[in-house]
């Protein structure tokens, strides 16, 4: 009888370990990337994972959560900025993806906005 119980317990443990491992198998696809953007224009930073099942997303700027405003907000798993501002949007942006069942979170690589001045950007496109 104890052998049967040990086998049953072993099977249950394997099933639970296998289920947990499968839920936590996700990676960024696509991961956020640094971009050039003209100050005052809009930008979208993409973020998604290979397996969205039970995944919640949020963004950080220099390690602090990005709060939704009318100018900057999370759109699904992406971050949108309608009016890029050098003072408010410069820094290290990261997407955080968390499996809400297990609590395991992945932090993306750093993405930065290379914010170009309007004056400099226009001279690039319309040389004098």
Predicted regions and their residues:
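Immunoglobulin-superfamily
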Residues: 2-128
């Amino acid at each position: 009888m104890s052998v049967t119980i040990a086998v049953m317990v072993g099977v249950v443990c394997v099933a639970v370990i296998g289920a947990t491992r499968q839920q936590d198998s996700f990676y960024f696809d696509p991961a956020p990337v640094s971009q050039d953007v003209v100050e005052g224009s809009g930008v979208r930073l993409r973020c998604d994972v290979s397996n969205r099942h039970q995944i919640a997303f949020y963004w950080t700027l220099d390690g602090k959560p990005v709060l939704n405003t009318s100018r900057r907000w999370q759109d699904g798993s992406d971050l949108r900025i309608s009016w890029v501002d050098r003072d408010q949007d410069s820094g290290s942006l990261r997407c955080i993806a968390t499996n809400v069942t297990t609590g395991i979170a992945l932090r993306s690589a750093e993405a930065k906005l290379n914010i170009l001045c309007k004056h400099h950007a226009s001279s690039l496109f319309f040389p004098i």
